[in-house]
């Protein structure tokens, strides 16, 4: 399903953006705190974008299942793998943001 593939790719891109901004915020925290704070806010905005994409990915799979349309085995295997990978990467990105906040954001 091309739509699901596109959503997975976009979610992955969004996670990379979250990590980039969060890592930059950590590096700039002492050197330029206002910019670091801005980067964390942008990372948090990307969290919202990621959550919307994730919601739609899950919705697509659930729609297929609810219509009694068998999700092709290959598609389910790919989805399961990609979904777990995205969840793990999301947790790592979220951790970077939370660590920054603990340091006094």
Regions found by a protein language model. Give the residues of each.
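Iron-associated oxidoreductase/ferritin-like identity signal
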Residues: 1-105
């Amino acid at each position: 399903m091309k739509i699901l593939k596109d959503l997975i790719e976009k979610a992955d891109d969004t996670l990379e953006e979250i990590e980039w901004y969060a890592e930059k915020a950590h590096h700039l925290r002492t050197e330029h705190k206002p910019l670091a704070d801005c980067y964390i806010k942008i990372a948090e905005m990307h969290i919202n974008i990621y959550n919307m994409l994730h919601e739609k990915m899950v919705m697509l799979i659930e729609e297929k299942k609810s219509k009694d349309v068998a999700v092709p085995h290959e598609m389910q295997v790919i989805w399961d793998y990609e979904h777990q990978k995205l969840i793990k990467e999301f947790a790592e990105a979220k951790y970077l943001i939370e660590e920054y906040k603990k340091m006094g954001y």
